[in-house]
């Protein structure tokens, strides 16, 4: 597997400005001097997203849960009560204990856990997993790509867990048993403040990534009309050049017929109503054949109205 080839394919599929995924792996060699991370270990992820490599260890992770889920320590005694009685993520402390016992978290046999953007590593050789931080549109592409060659009901899984458990622990376990599951995460309210509101995590263990690397260009992410429409929207959002007015607008809906002072949501609904008269209006609105839902028409209007407002 060649990193540069994957990056080229990824950017072709999701846009040149799509945020690159993050690789993580263990080793006994410190890749980068890293200060202690107070609280949630994902506080350091901004540095990684900006291109810096981070090397975490038992000394630099201060969160007891973070140390435990990365395999550097045993579970602190207070964790079951904290997760249940304080955070209220499980009904009882016993449920937390049962969850942890079932999970069988592997102990770290190396001194450091590293995170780096994939364009900052030389190869995938030591990597345990690849972490994506996708928006909903990009996530839809990643999930669809995952399902391309895997019919398993748990091909994409969203198990309970903290941010570090859903991203790191689950991925490590899956990779070391050569599994095929991928993982949705960042449903944990405690980790969400450290990331944008429209992002989730999607993690692919290297055991599965080795297969998916070869299927990307075969999947719907290339040369399909459906993904092409989503890719256009992704690229439009990445450009940062679009400014949509929230105030009422006026524009022609048919020759000599104007919609006056309406909100864009109402305009989309009106366009959707036209759906019942496609044959009659095809001459006037040739694009309606490509519109299937209110969301389609609203997306179209946003694109058009961002270019020329009347």
Q: Where do the model's predicted regions map?
A:
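Acidic, serine/proline-rich low-complexity intrinsically disordered regions
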Residues: 2-246
